[in-house]
């Protein structure tokens, strides 16, 4: 029989590192329109920076580290990547929202279900064409609607990360642009529903940024009110 000792932290509890005055002063000088954050809150290497020395495993941080992360004065947003691999429910989003302050925002990836032209195996290899690629109905039902309902005013950017395309699709980018236009037009009004929310598009093929296609992509985003997500992979 093991009896917990008073005052000792539970093994799964993640405690924030109290920020010093330098960090607080720096955060106070930042424009409220600038939000710094990371793509995850589960990095063990932040011990002694974001949370106390721990040590904490990645699994413990993934489950219990969000609240501690959100208490750091400089970290006012974070990414949710797991939504890319499987759609999340309204309840799952709501649980995230309940762990952070009102002024915190989430950057959420749309599921590969609607952003990848291929159905992929466990190692990332393409197996077959994805018939749900850029499907506006599924994008709304499986992503936009539950994210808005669960995160509420804490929605930051809802990102459609377009995965690398097969060669045949790369030869038909003008047609894909029209499908992207139709998708973005059909989505609920994220800007109107939230204080800071935007729909964003990230591309993973350099061909999207060619002299011919890039102006067309920019026109689609401008017309539909979407934002370009600058990434390092195109």
Protein language model annotation of sequence segments:
Residues 1-234:
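Residues lining hydrophobic/aromatic ligand-binding pockets adjacent to catalytic sites
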